[in-house]
Amino acid sequence: MSAANTERLKDEGSKLQVVVAGATAGMIARFVIAPLDVVKIRLQLQTHSLSDPLSQRAELLRGGPVYKGTLSTMRHIARQEGITGLWKGNVPAELLYITYSAVQFATYRSAAQLLHRVAGEDRQLPAAAESFVAGAAAGVTSTTVTYPLDLLRTRFAAQGSGDDRVYQSLRRAVADIWRDEGYRGFFRGIGPAVGQTFPFMGIFFAAYESLRAPLADLKLPFWGGQLALASMTASTLAKTAVFPLDLVRRRIQVQGPTRSKYVHKNIPEYKGTFSTISTIARTEGFRGLYRGLTVSLIKSAPASAVTMWTYERVLRALITFQSGRQD
């Protein structure tokens, strides 16, 4: 078992190295999973009943699409909006992923080290508990800092093409939201976002740190496969646990004066987290709270694997480079 695999994340690299590695990991991960992200958002914004054909027919009559699954949704978007439609919102999304990952890893490292110092050598928290708290703090901090970019990413992914576009550019979108909705418009849905991020990141980092060392000696056919497997497993567990709140966040993000102008024309008006959950459960059934879960897991697992694999490799390269310069 290598030292790199037995060390915990909080003990590796300087703050600058962590920020650079995190930003690089976020940038690469976003580009890889962009089409799946657009598909997930489109599926999450559908509001027709999954079991009622009449509801689906009504959606078609209103001019909105009815998406059935990951691959068919991807084909539909590519056919109707061009292949670039699968990368809608990529500019704010890239900025989001780069900033989010940099803040996330830096905060995780700082929070874990702070917990270690506060507890003292004699009263250390269990490693899993320390990882949960530090991961949750990292998730809440990075979500809050980057939330306006997340909202912009969702709105761009939800809009149509050509004359059906709600926003013509990122600059125009920022100006329109500021004019029509004020600064609060950039933070629509932040309640469920933070509500799902706290347990998600806590579960993810606790599971990842717990699996990282045991899987280190596992023989896999590709370099770094143990890290990828640990992150994919952790991501699947965490995402499934908090998915309804992720869906609620998306629904609330497209509220406001542009609500009826996106690809899905019939998005209801939602007021708050709990009333949104209640409305979705009543009108779409319990399954409605898990729309897009499959593609979310398909997206989340490789995204987490790419992020953690890239982060650890870039960080290791930066540490090696720094050591070489000092020698």
Swiss-Prot record:
InterPro entries: Mit_carrier, Mitochondrial_sb/sol_carrier, Mt_carrier_dom_sf
Keyword Transmembrane helix: yes
Membrane topology of this protein: Multi-pass membrane protein
Start and stop residues of the Solcar repeats: 13-114, 126-214, 222-317
Any single GO BP term: transmembrane transport
Entry GO CC: mitochondrial inner membrane
Gene3D superfamilies named in the record: Mitochondrial carrier domain (1.50.40.10)
Subcellular localization(s) per the UniProt record: Mitochondrion inner membrane
Alphabetical keyword list: Membrane, Mitochondrion, Mitochondrion inner membrane, Repeat, Transmembrane, Transmembrane helix, Transport
Domain of life: Eukaryota
Keyword Transmembrane helix: yes
Transmembrane feature ranges: 16-36, 95-111, 132-152, 189-209, 223-245, 292-309
Family membership noted in the UniProt record: Belongs to the mitochondrial carrier (TC 2.A.29) family.
Function summary: Mitochondrial transporter that mediates uptake of thiamine pyrophosphate (ThPP) into mitochondria.
The protein, known as: Mitochondrial thiamine pyrophosphate carrier 1
